[in-house]
Amino acid sequence: LFGHGNRHLPYLIHAFDRAVQRGIGQDSGRLELRQVAQQTLDGGWQPIYRPGEALQPAPPFVPKPPPCPERLTVLLETPLRLRLAEKLMGADAFQFGALFANLLRRISLLITFHADTPLEADFAGLSRAGWTIRQRAARLRWHEWTRYSSRQDALLQMGGLVGEIELDGTGLEPFWPYLWLGQWTHAGKGAVMG
């Protein structure tokens, strides 16, 4: 959870627990909530809740990025759905600028709505500069998947790019804090769907 979203943690746990007991998805699959864990400053995980016990979250913290590496591999583990000129961007058309512009917008919105201090950055300048970054290598493929929308009573296409992009660290310093934060966000069409 980001910033002010942490205030809603007890309600999210309760809602999730109720939802999984009732069944989720088109086939009403049932699950059991056994534990909730929170990431610690050192990158580990600490249990903060088990059913029948009190919720004991640690205070939220803002992680500090390490120094920018000399070389960087961006892993796209979940489908990244980007649009460029009203078309979905495939593996052959991938450009770092599109990824970075979406990531910067996503982080900016998260900070605007979930933090007490607005993000101060040259958004236009950073976005323009992102289009000048070239990847060393890209091993991307399209991964198609669907999700069921109860509201629309239909399956929705949610496919996107998965794989990895290798970047030379030279010139990445202005982008690094956002790329590093991006490991905890989604960036692209449908990002709010998780």
Predicted regions and their residues:
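RNA-interacting cores
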Residues: 1-194
